[in-house]
Amino acid sequence: MRDIQFTKEALFDIEAAVLWYEEQRTGLSYDFELCLEAGIDAILRNPEAFQKKYKDIKIRFISRFPYGIHYTYNDNTIIVIAVFHTSRSPKNWSKRLGL
């Protein structure tokens, strides 16, 4: 099993989404976290399974929520770079992803 690491920016993305969903409806943030965890588990099981979006960065979309988990990986480690809302402009995140 590979290790998984999150950049500080990815952790901020997650925190911001959780706070936003909790403001929308009590308990919705919990649903988001469960779907996020399921997506991360799927990446851990088979990181090769998901679409290569740009360069060496892959994306796994989160079920029920309009977010994608952007990550890279090697033999030992998965690095989550970002958890972006799918409507965000590529101009906003291309710098963070090194594009």
Residue ranges of model-derived segments:
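Residue-level recognition of specific faces of alpha-helices
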Residues: 8, 13, 17, 39-42, ...
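Enriched for short, Lys/Arg-rich terminal
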Residues: 72-99
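Basic/aromatic recognition patch in beta-strand/loop cores that engages polyanionic ligands
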Residues: 38, 45-78
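Short, hydrophobic secondary-structure boundary micro-motifs
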Residues: 30, 51-53, 92
